[in-house]
């Protein structure tokens, strides 16, 4: 399963949201993510992809779409 597919599956499991058609939509503005959801997502991303997401790098504007989240995971895997 690709990173993109896994991230989409995480959103479905954690938030019961199908974000597959919302790849570039702001997930905060759409009501999919909030502060608590962000923490849940970070924990799941770290566990699923065996990465460490520095809170200082998890800016709302940098991780607000599925596409940006996938790119962030890819960058952290290659860091």
UniProtKB/Swiss-Prot annotation:
Its main location: cytoplasm. The modification O-(pantetheine 4'-phosphoryl)serine is found at residue 35. It comes from the Bacteria. PROSITE patterns: CARRIER. It is found in: Cytoplasm. Pathway: Cell wall biogenesis; lipoteichoic acid biosynthesis. Keywords: Cell wall biogenesis/degradation, Cytoplasm, Phosphopantetheine, Phosphoprotein. Residues 1-77 form the Carrier domain. One of its GO terms (molecular function) is D-alanyl carrier activity. 4'-phosphopantetheine is transferred from CoA to a specific serine of apo-DCP. One of its GO terms (cellular component) is cytoplasm. It holds the Pfam family PP-binding. The keyword rRNA processing does not apply. The keyword Cell wall biogenesis/degradation applies. One of its GO terms (biological process) is lipoteichoic acid biosynthetic process. NCBIfam families: dltC, PRK05087.1. Belongs to the DltC family. Carrier protein involved in the D-alanylation of lipoteichoic acid (LTA). The loading of thioester-linked D-alanine onto DltC is catalyzed by D-alanine--D-alanyl carrier protein ligase DltA. The DltC-carried D-alanyl group is further transferred to cell membrane phosphatidylglycerol (PG) by forming an ester bond, probably catalyzed by DltD. D-alanylation of LTA plays an important role in modulating the properties of the cell wall in Gram-positive bacteria, influencing the net charge of the cell wall. This is D-alanyl carrier protein. The gene is dltC.
